[in-house]
Design a protein with these regions (language model features):
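Short, charged helix-capping/linker segments at alpha-helix termini
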Residues: 3-7, 21-29, 40-58, 161
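Sigma70-family region 2
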Residues: 21-22, 46-49, 58-75, 94-97
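Amphipathic, Lys/Arg- and hydrophobic-enriched alpha-helical face
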Residues: 32-50, 66, 129, 174
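Structural recognition of an alpha-helix C-terminal capping motif at a helix-to-coil junction
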Residues: 54-61, 74-86
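DNA-recognition helix of helix-turn-helix
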Residues: 85, 89, 136, 157-181
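Helix-turn-helix DNA-binding module
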Residues: 130, 134-138, 146-163
């Protein structure tokens, strides 16, 4: 699927990537403007809203630093998306959340309050995702939103494939409960 920046003339985006890799800040700014909304949306779904802005900036700092490593084997947006997912995963691991949220202890997930905070507040899909426990949210976003397979998620997060499947099942149940107002 082509992203907005790649629907331009291919040479324009390729040119910006090449120029930015050579240190051209204006070209990097164009790349940033083309891709920031999608990357921020991804970080918002995988992390808390409060962390999304900071992590999005971290992703683009890392992009600037690693742009010289982009070989063009895939679309720039694919490379950037993968870099973003890696930064988010690294961020979560650095806070030692990984062990707690990926434990096989279902009691940790059962402690989630699934009802809306206020009955009169309209619950939408994004807020339902935010209500998921961090591990379930991450797997839900990677699988159902971003389209990764369980085996790919297992490798990315260093978990068992079965853990990914259980977390996704639990996330879907919690989403249903949250969206139905139960």
């Amino acid at each position: 699927m082509a992203l907005s920046g790649e629907t331009q003339a291919g040479s324009g985006l390729d040119s910006d990537v090449a120029l930015a890799a050579g240190g051209d800040q204006s070209a990097f700014e164009r790349l940033y403007r083309t891709h920031v909304a999608r990357i921020h949306s991804l970080t918002r779904r995988m992390l808390s809203t409060q962390e999304a802005d900071e992590v999005t900036q971290d992703i683009f700092v890392r992009t600037w630093q690693k742009l010289g490593q982009f070989r063009g084997d895939s679309a720039f947006s694919t490379w950037l998306h993968r870099l973003a997912v890696n930064v988010v995963i690294e961020r979560r691991r650095s806070f030692a959340i990984q062990r707690e949220r990926m434990s096989d202890d279902p009691a940790a997930l059962d402690s989630l309050t699934v009802g809306p905070a206020r009955a009169d507040l309209k619950v939408d899909f994004e807020s339902a995702i935010e209500q998921l426990p961090p591990g379930a949210r991450e797997i839900f976003v990677l699988h159902d939103v971003e389209g990764y397979k369980h085996r790919e998620i297992a490798v990315m997060l260093d978990i068992a494939t079965g853990t990914s499947k259980r977390q996704l099942h639990r996330a879907r149940m919690l989403m249903r409960q949250h969206l139905s107002g139960e």
